[in-house]
Amino acid sequence: MADSGNPNENTPSVATGENGEVTGSYNASAITVLEGLDAVRKRPGMYIGSTGERGLHHLVTEVVDNSVDEALAGHADTIDVTILADGGVRVVDNGRGIPVGIVPSEGKPAVEVVLTVLHAGGKFGGGGYSVSGGLHGVGVSVVNALSTKVAVEVKTDGYRWTQDYKLGVPTRRCAQNEATDETGTTVTFWADPDVFETTEYSFETLSRRFQEMAFLNKGLTLKLTDERESAKAVVGADVAGTDSAETPGEEPVRSVTYYYEGGIVDFVKYLNSRKGDLIHPTVIDIDAEDKERMLSVEIAMQWNSQYSEGVYSFANTIHTHEGGTHEEGFRAAMTGLVNRYAREKKFLREKDDNLAGEDIREGLTAIISVKLGEPQFEGQTKTKLGNTEAKTFVQKIVHEHLTDWFDRHPNEAADIIRKSIQAATARVAARKARDLTRRKGLLESASLPGKLSDCQSNDPSKCEIFIVEGDSAGGSAKSGRNPQYQAILPIRGKILNVEKARIDKILQNTEVQALISAFGTGVHEDFDIEKLRYHKIILMADADVDGQHINTLLLTFLFRFMRPLVEAGHVYLSRPPLYKIKWGRDDFEYAYSDRERDALVELGKQNGKRIKEDSIQRFKGLGEMNAEELRITTMDVDHRVLGQVTLDDAAQADDLFSVLMGEDVEARRSFIQRNAKDVRFLDI
């Protein structure tokens, strides 16, 4: 092995640009340096959002985003990610390889600069990528800084090059190895346990993100493999699309491969596969580009017979959770066009009001994916697109293509209009119902539901409300609460399955009315999160199947009609114990799972304790606990276990609720069979 501190700077080929392709040389001179890495280890949250599970997975996606940039530029079509047996992660792509030539301003190989200097990457300065999805250069250097060690291997300029790092610092110079005709980059890293609260990766979290990436990058193959011992026990019981890979003489490993030739058209088909009947059989596919402004848009859309809207937008493959100008252009074009068409074809008479945007989008599943040279992100989480040119471009393209599609498919267009009119009728009926109930005070927080045991504090940030199924459990909860800041709302039985009902019917449900008035925010178009009366909404149901069903019904309602509560982190699931282990009169412990029960019993026996066969009590429901037991195990802030409901991926959550609460029985059975062993918290 020859150790070269001054790698040969061969002249790379220059690719000229279609959309997303390289517009200049991708060599050492294309790597621009903006600032150092000093602060990353001191304040990691500023760069990756958190040092919890979400931040840990962000490391993986930052490295993968760099490989996706190569795919966007047309130079890579395969990305292979492996969770190693020792907890490391390896990301391999078949792109051109990070350049190894010397960066003039630094006097170091480009690969070392990219890995050790913040904001050093090929997307800055205009000489590298015309479209970039990740923080290219920022991400991989931050990953390096927050890892105990990193190994990089680059195949470029006819050789294989390697370099190793420890805590962000090179441990040796970039080494030139054997000759090779292949190209690509391999980054292997081990996250620092002194920085992160956990270094345990979730196969499901990564596979969901990679499936989304594969949908958004037509023709890209993304493979995820898990070589950890814990993965071998669940091979064959994984997420949809998971394969098990087995080499003769070796145990199978858990792996999944995603490849979608149809891109976002396949994404819409996937999301609509659980949505019941379709209003039109083919997905509407829009694809347009403005090369001069380095702007392109892909849209896939299809209406189904359900009542919820599922419009998801992306900019440079980044999920724009907060929407933005591309969504605004899409909505404006569609609302204007459908109303004009409905009047021209006499579906709407002169005296009729226009259809609202929400009427037209009822049952619509759509993916909007724009790619821009200089995306401007705004909003609280920097996931709202701000480019004004995106709105005008998308609005123009959608209007042109949708007008043409309606003219060529008059029967399907008529069905879409009829569904929109039905939605408008229901919306007006719901408005009248809201006005009526508002006059009666049923939806106003000023007239709280009679069964609500409210708390004394008026500070929402300190207040929490427990939604409890059944009056008996509600009675125990009321007695066991801290009345200063804990409120109790008992609900009777299972609330309405909102997945199968329109808003007018939903607002007639007594339990739904109680929830809306207790929370104080209003619902749907009247929703105002500033009026929320409790910053913790805690769903407290039995630990059995019925209890989980009730929680799922409640979560479906919150997701469909009060989604900002979930997005803002206000919704929690309580975790009541399953067992009480009695060692003696005043010596007992609680267990929250079968495994914990067995472990506590075994530990007790090792410590010389004895237990009778009838000394392990299984709680069948919250009503079996007295007020003191409920307080200690499930309500006391010092002892309880809560699971915060998070929303990392709205499209995946939409699909999950469609599976759990929709009409497709077989899809629901399949999901439960695959995931039954892993369900502890519903983390969506």
Curated annotation (Swiss-Prot):
Enzyme class label: isomerase
Disordered, as annotated region: 1-22
One GO cellular component term noted in the UniProt record for this chain: chromosome
Cofactor(s) the protein needs: Mg(2+); Mn(2+); Ca(2+)
GO MF annotation: an example: DNA binding
UniProt catalytic activity: ATP-dependent breakage, passage and rejoining of double-stranded DNA
Primary location recorded for the protein, binned into one broad class: cytoplasm
Annotated positions binding Mg(2+) 2: D542, D544
Location of region: Novobiocin-binding: 154-302
Cofactor detail note: Binds two Mg(2+) per subunit. The magnesium ions form salt bridges with both the protein and the DNA. Can also accept other divalent metal cations, such as Mn(2+) or Ca(2+).
InterPro entries per UniProt: DNA_gyrase_B_C, GyrB, HATPase_C_sf, Ribosomal_Su5_D2-typ_SF, Ribsml_uS5_D2-typ_fold_subgr, Topo_IIA, Topo_IIA-like_dom_sf, Topo_IIA_B
Localization in the cell: Cytoplasm
One biological process term in Gene Ontology: DNA topological change
Entry keyword set: Antibiotic resistance, ATP-binding, Cytoplasm, DNA-binding, Isomerase, Magnesium, Metal-binding, Nucleotide-binding, Topoisomerase
Superkingdom to which the source organism belongs: Bacteria
CDD domains: HATPase_GyrB-like (cd16928), TopoII_Trans_DNA_gyrase (cd00822), TOPRIM_TopoIIA_GyrB (cd03366)
Family designation: Belongs to the type II topoisomerase GyrB family.
Subunit structure: Heterotetramer, composed of two GyrA and two GyrB chains. In the heterotetramer, GyrA contains the active site tyrosine that forms a transient covalent intermediate with DNA, while GyrB binds cofactors and catalyzes ATP hydrolysis.
UniProt xrefs under PANTHER family: DNA GYRASE SUBUNIT B, MITOCHONDRIAL (PTHR45866:SF1), DNA GYRASE/TOPOISOMERASE SUBUNIT B (PTHR45866)
Protein name: DNA gyrase subunit B, novobiocin-sensitive
